[in-house]
Amino acid sequence: MKTVFFDIDSQRDFLYPAGALYVPHAERIVPAIARRNRLAAAHGIPVLSTTDAHAEDDPEFSVWPPHCVAGTWGQHKAQATLVDGRITIPNRACDIALEGAPQIVVEKQTVDIFLAPNLARVVERLDADRYVVYGVVTEICVLYAVRGLLKTGKPVTVVTDAVAALTAEASARALEGIRAGGGRLATVSEIGVT
């Protein structure tokens, strides 16, 4: 069974208090994300990571404060979540070469990761039998990712102690919606590497 670990938006602007759109207490999940990513790479499990990469005048800033502007400190993934040998796929249509990359970082500009021009092709090329999802924000990008992945008909597990939300109530609603929609919920200790 081929597993893909899916690391959603583990970027400085979301994870750290100095970030432009800090998610309360999100820095607490950085070690869990880092361990998941390193463990996956050590066992040959692909890590598919997403990152916001906004323009300075991005339309999303009418809803949210400016954050993850391409090239800024806050747009970069937390260093601990990076895997050596990674590749980055920009937020524009392009050729994709995934062979041998332990971590594939896909840039996006919207909360729905499946609107990124390359994500569906990457998911198709990885041809997973199941997905393990973690990152930020539980009730926004993580939820969109899980909904999109569930449409593939493959099992999706959310690692509940490796996600962070804006509020506990929003997190509980999102996780219940994921479970009710066919997703599985598990903790870091319950997730194997195969």
What name fits each language-model region?
Residues 1-5:
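Extreme N-terminal starter segment of soluble prokaryotic enzymes
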Residues 6-8, 51, 160:
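Active-site flanking residues adjacent to catalytic metal/cofactor-binding acidic residues
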Residues 12, 55, 164:
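Short, glycine/acidic-enriched loop or turn micro-motifs at the edges of active sites
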Residues 18-26, 63-68:
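Short glycine-enriched, charge-decorated loop/helix-capping segments at active-site entrances
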Residues 31-130:
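Active-site alpha/beta core segments
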Residues 35-39, 140-151:
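Histidine-anchored nucleotide/phosphate-binding helix
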Residues 88, 185-194:
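A charged, well-structured terminal subsegment
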Residues 132-135, 154-168:
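A short glycine-rich beta-strand->turn/loop micro-motif centered on a GG-aromatic cluster
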